[in-house]
């Protein structure tokens, strides 16, 4: 995947060269609009898949708390993934019966075994599960950047 920092360079170079295709990316590009020094107009029409939206009702409590604690910055999927990650690990620790007196190796072993057994619903997905390789099952949503905002694509 390409993340938003290198993607910003690609978009700037494309504009400088007069190259104007429809760019498509994934969740690694979420955050490009708030990157310091980036001209958001360069991302106009960019399509991306991301598991998080700061504009849907289900995330508003998190968005308001995050924005208040971070000088008005709106969270992107990286912030939401981190938030979910803490609670996913907490759930796995509890279900595995981990305690503070366990060795780190024993905790890791218990977590690996437990991760394929849990299902978690959070900011970035509903009923998320993990396979033995650690891959998560969650459905992203398609967005288009229009006028500096993430919007659902028109049918």
Predicted regions and their residues:
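Extracytosolic ligand-binding ectodomains
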Residues: 1-155
